[in-house]
Regions:
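Fe-S-dependent hydro-lyases/dehydratases of central metabolism
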Residues: 1-428
Length: 428
């Protein structure tokens, strides 16, 4: 009996596992992307003789091109050529349809009770589906490619209980900022974070992804939500795999945080740290050069819908540019069918191919010296999007859209109210 993390490890090993134990387990999936695969391949090569020169299972080994796709430099193109060669050699399919943390779940590779390791810190996103998923260094991932196994010290668990209801203009992203503010950027170091409470139980899978994605911003080893009927409905048609619907049983949490969502308002994470969180009213009127809507945190269809609703029929401020990057091909096509992409383009935004976009500061919208951006990313570290003197503010998709219209950080509630009024008039 224990936390969801303990239940997953116990189920996997066929015995009771407790926090603090060091265990070796078989993993269900191993993933790396275009910037982390080269070192993982090097580590794999060193073990190639022991593994017969083959990955443990090519159907459970995944390489995703998302960080710099299409290649923006000769160096990136060369690395991608070499990764493709390795993938052909190992019969691994290279996925090129969006961000790894969106594409892996969409393809049904993530199911409740699974253990997944990825060469990216935001692999914890998959915990929204009831999996234990964590980021590892490329060397560890290379070993996992070779053996299909890895070791863990089963982490202790922090519980974040969220109750109440979302106020007007407040979204899952705003709640994550409040979490990071309370817990701190290192308050959950090597801890699992389990999100519970009445509000969590009513969230969509997309909103749950936002929560679990930012577990690492508190130092979390993993972020998890107990799977339920909402999880099963989302997975229906995506996988035929059987999976256990595990849940905590008399869990012993190291610490419990309580958040009443009803008391929140739109929040902003100010540079240079994610836990530098303030109510939006404290920073309105700060001029913004670029707005970026997308990433594995907020590049999903509901995020695009919120922003498109605010931008519909309007024009982006002339002093501000806007970049929109859907998280996956599936989302891109759905947004195109629903007219969201047309709305963005008519408003003056640049819509880019699915991927990470300017999130890591390599291409597709990097910042010049002294510029400011408002983005839906998960990080605002110095130099994250370009020049180290540039500043990055983080907000919700609604805040991003409102800011793009005003040319400065803006409270989205005014625009949301206008949109609601216009819809009401249209139906009368």
């Amino acid at each position: 009996m224990g936390t969801l993390t303990e239940e997953i490890f116990s189920h996997k090993l066929g015995r009771t596992v407790e926090q603090g134990e060091t265990v070796i387990v078989e993993v269900d999936r191993v993933m790396s992307h275009d910037t982390t695969s080269p070192l993982a391949i090097q580590a794999f090569r060193k073990l190639a003789q022991q593994s017969g020169g083959r990955v443990f299972n090519p159907r459970r080994s995944h390489i995703v091109f998302d960080h710099i796709i299409p290649a923006a430099t000769i160096a990136a193109a060369t690395l991608q050529r070499d990764i493709r060669s390795f993938a052909r050699e190992q019969d691994i399919t290279v996925l090129q349809e969006g961000i790894c943390h969106q594409v892996m779940p969409e393809r049904g590779y993530v199911v409740p009770g699974s253990i997944i390791v990825g060469a990216d810190s935001h692999t914890c996103t998959y915990g929204a589906l009831g999996a234990f998923a964590t980021g590892m260094g490329s060397t560890d991932i290379g070993v996992a490619y070779a053996t299909g196994r890895t070791w863990f010290r089963v982490p202790t668990t922090i519980n974040i209980e969220i109750t109440g209801s979302l106020p007007f203009g407040v979204y899952a992203k705003d709640i994550t900022f409040e979490m990071v503010r309370q817990v701190g950027v290192d308050g959950a170091n090597y801890r699992a974070i389990e999100y519970t409470g009445s509000l969590v139980e009513g969230l969509s899978v997309s909103e749950r992804f936002t929560f679990c994605n930012m577990a690492i911003e508190m130092g979390g080893k993993a972020g998890l939500i107990t799977p339920d009927a909402i999880t099963q409905a989302w997975l229906h048609g995506r996988t035929t795999a059987e999976y256990p619907m595990l849940s905590p049983r008399n869990p012993q949490y190291e610490r419990v945080f309580h958040i009443d969502a009803s008391r929140l308002q739109p929040m902003i994470a100010c540079p240079p740290d994610v836990n530098n969180v303030v109510p939006i009213g404290d920073v309105t009127n700060i001029g913004i050069d670029e707005v970026f809507l997308g990433t594995c945190t907020n590049g999903r269809l509901d995020d695009l819908a919120i922003a498109a609703g605010i931008l519909h029929g309007k024009t982006i401020h002339p002093n501000t540019r806007m970049v929109v990057v859907p998280a996956s091909r599936e989302i891109y096509l759905a947004a195109m069918r629903l007219g969201y992409l047309e709305t963005f383009i008519q408003a003056g935004a640049t819509v880019e191919n699915p991927g990470c976009g300017p999130c890591i500061g390599r291409h597709q919208g990097v910042l010049a010296p002294g510029e400011r951006a408002l983005t839906t990313m998960n990080r605002n570290f110095t130099g994250r999007m370009g020049d180290p003197t540039a500043e990055i503010y983080l907000g919700s998709p609604a805040t991003a859209a409102a800011t793009a219209l005003c040319g400065h950080i803006a409270d989205p509630r005014e625009f949301l109210a206008q949109h609601a009024t216009n819809e009401q008039h249209a139906t009368n």
